[in-house]
Amino acid sequence: MSAMLVVLLAAGGGSRFAGPTHKLLHVLPDGRTVSAHAIDHAVEADIGPVLVVTGAVEVPVPAGVHTLHHAGWRDGQATSLAAAIDHADQLGVSHVLLALADQPGIPAEAWRRIAGHHEAPIGPHGDEVIVVASYDGRRGPHPVRLHRSSWSLLPRTGDDGARSLIRDQAHLVREVACPGSAADIDTLEDVTRWKSS
């Protein structure tokens, strides 16, 4: 068992975005949507199968990208992540690489660096490390690489996602310097900042 599943969470309602469409469907200056940027970079990285977890809106995906509709998306990001983890468990993959579909600035190279980080298991129990991205010396943390041994420690309710695992298992976290930015698009002001970066 060694395959990696790339997961983009795209289920949330995007309630802070005041544009005419859902934030993931907002078209950026190059004609692609916010989510298309994120998905295209994940596909370009060529790490493994890509899964987009949808909910509030259906996000268009290119051929070969899988979607998983999460009907319980209103119950928080952790429930969307749990749906992805359950899917990954059924597939039998060893790792999940995770980011959000509203992060258009994470390039393929960042995905590759997180996927390619190798470190022997640590500690008396042989725990696998949790690999997170850093950008210009600041923790992203996305993409995040999670070995299946850590999946049971992830929250299954609320809005925390993988943050609580990263916080609670800090001794296992390894940062890898990456190009790009993990800034997310939550508001129209974020779009303006993204355009000027």
Protein language model annotation of sequence segments:
Residues 24, 49, 66, 172-174:
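Conserved beta-strand segments of alpha/beta enzyme cores
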Residues 74-154:
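Conserved beta-loop-beta/alpha segment of the NTase-like Rossmann-fold superfamily
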Residues 2-6, 152-197:
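Conserved alpha/beta core of the MobA/IspD/sugar-nucleotide pyrophosphorylase nucleotidyltransferase superfamily
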Residues 34-99, 109:
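Conserved N-terminal catalytic core of the sugar/cofactor nucleotidyltransferase
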Residues 29, 68-73, 176-177:
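Short beta->alpha connector loops at strand-helix junctions that form conserved
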Residues 16, 60, 104-105:
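A short, conserved beta-strand element in the Rossmann-like catalytic core
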Residues 1-54:
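N-terminal glycine-rich phosphate-binding loop and ensuing alpha1 helix
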Residues 9-11, 53, 99-101, 133-135, ...:
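Short beta-strand segments
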